[in-house]
């Protein structure tokens, strides 16, 4: 890619720093769109997804996914799924998004749910 946008440059910086700090821990990857928010725990060594949650899940689907309350709900659901999978320590991958608003709400709820990062 000859011309990277500011977002793409930031995403590369974040991912490079995560690889250096991961130390074998799974990555909590977050993606935010205008309507929804998605989060998943990824084991990069094995290349598998350990747990996932989003505002498109059946239990949450009727509500809007573009609020901090919905993001917090996704964080709680992901933390519960991570506990079920036996994961407590993760590396938070904000993926180029600023740590503010819905991203911060999801992270705080995941921490309250028992994930450490």
From Swiss-Prot:
Q: Name the cystine pairs.
A: none
* UniProt KW keywords: Ribonucleoprotein, Ribosomal protein, RNA-binding, rRNA-binding
GO annotation terms (biological process): translation
UniProt-listed Pfam families: Ribosomal_L18p
Work out whether the entry's keyword set contains Nucleotidyltransferase: no
**Does this UniProt record's set of keywords contain Translocase?**
no
**A cellular component annotation (GO) from this entry:** cytosolic large ribosomal subunit
Annotated GO molecular function terms are: 5S rRNA binding; structural constituent of ribosome
Q: Which domain of life is it from?
A: Bacteria
Signal peptide residues on this chain, from the entry's feature table? none
Q: Which family does it belong to?
A: Belongs to the universal ribosomal protein uL18 family.
The UniProt entry, under NCBIfam families, shows: L18_bact
Describe the subunit structure. Answer: Part of the 50S ribosomal subunit; part of the 5S rRNA/L5/L18/L25 subcomplex. Contacts the 5S and 23S rRNAs.
Q: What does this protein do?
A: This is one of the proteins that bind and probably mediate the attachment of the 5S RNA into the large ribosomal subunit, where it forms part of the central protuberance.
Q: What is this protein called?
A: Large ribosomal subunit protein uL18
Q: Which organism is it from?
A: Sphingopyxis alaskensis (strain DSM 13593 / LMG 18877 / RB2256) (Sphingomonas alaskensis)
- What gene name does this entry carry? rplR
């Amino acid at each position: 890619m000859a011309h990277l946008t500011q977002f793409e440059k930031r995403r590369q910086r974040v991912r490079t720093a995560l690889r250096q700090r991961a130390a074998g821990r799974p990555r909590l990857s977050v993606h935010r769109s205008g309507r929804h928010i998605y989060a998943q725990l990824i084991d990069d060594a094995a290349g598998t997804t350990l747990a996932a949650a989003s505002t498109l899940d059946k239990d949450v689907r009727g509500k809007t996914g573009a609020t901090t309350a919905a993001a917090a709900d996704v964080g709680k659901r992901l933390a519960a799924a991570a506990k079920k999978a036996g994961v407590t320590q993760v590396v938070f991958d904000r993926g180029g998004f600023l740590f503010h608003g819905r991203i911060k709400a999801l992270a705080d709820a995941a921490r309250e749910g028992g994930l450490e990062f």
